[in-house]
Swiss-Prot record:
Family of this protein: Belongs to the PqqD family.
Keyword S-adenosyl-L-methionine carried by entry: no
Protein name in the entry: PqqA binding protein
Organism: Pseudomonas fluorescens (strain ATCC BAA-477 / NRRL B-23932 / Pf-5)
Cysteine disulfide links: none
Keyword Endoplasmic reticulum: no
Amino acid sequence: MSFDRSKTPRWRPGYRFQYEPAQKGHVLLYPEGMIKLNDSAALIGGLIDGERDVAAIISELEIQFPGVAELGEDIEQFMEVARAQHWIELA
């Protein structure tokens, strides 16, 4: 089954993406705690705004990182993990 890049991700209610100076990186805050994101996840997370679909997020990152092999597949994988962990909703 292929991933539907026309879906628009948004953070679930109660989840907030932000830079956390104490962690020296981006985190995802939620009522029960916090998840520190790696640099790649932070770049993707910074583009999740409830407006852009996955295809637009991929296009934006392809502009920033031209020639990176399998970039689209990596972003799809992040979206699948984030959805499975209930961080995002895809509509």
